Amino acid sequence: MKNLIYQYYLPYEAFDADIGGIEMPEWAHSGSRSCQAYAKHCNAEYELNHTRYFEHLDPRLDSLRVIYDPYFDQFDKVLSIDLDMLIATRDNIFDLDIEDVAMVHELGLHTSTSGGWLRKVMDSKLSQRGIIAYGKHLFGPGWMFPRSKLYPKERFRYLNGGLQLWSKAGRLKAREHFKSVDNYVLHTRYTEQMYINLQLSQPIFKVTELDTSWNRNSAYQWKDTPDGKINHFLARAKFTMPKLEQIYYHLLQPRE
């Protein structure tokens, strides 16, 4: 098996430009070093990219590169993981049995402080860039996001794009069946996460839901003490990553 951990860094833009400029900030270096150590632990290759694939689109859409760029066809499984995440486990994610893709539902998002924003984005009319209305435009009037299998009481499944574990078969299937990225941006102007959720709602895709320990976020799943296998530092929580990096880094060192 030839597996890859893939990350990319592109300068932040607009209202959150202070999080990272042309040079990679220290929090991003922390995330990179963490994933390099994890790749070595998992006997996987590691790649950090700085070049844009979709040069005409929002840089955050470049996480889709692992799907559309034939370069990745040489790999069996590809773990695309954001730089604002730290690995805190020795469990090998590549050992998980998946079909097309494995991701984590954002448990608690619908009822969090971001829930109002999400409802507005999702439930607005198509003319107002509504995501659900756009989904019905793509897939038919009866379409709706599926329920989470692990967390069925949630309104619908909403997968966080910060961690995506793709099989080769899944990437090739996505390349064939995902709808136009340009059309999505034209209608919604949103980023990759909602695009991926829309596309993976198609019944043809076999999505493995991982529990939240594989992508625990700082906004509403933990506050002071990260408690996941992989911890996701959203917004300005990123600036705490360098202090925690060494704690997790030692977990991944070879044991005698």
Placement of each model-derived feature along the sequence:
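GT-A fold catalytic core of metal-dependent nucleotide-sugar glycosyltransferases
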Residues: 59-128
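N-terminal anchoring/stem segment of glycosyltransferases
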Residues: 1-76, 234-238, 255
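Short catalytic/ligand-binding loop motif for oxyanion handling, primarily in non-cytosolic enzymes
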Residues: 14, 54-56, 87-90, 94-96, ...
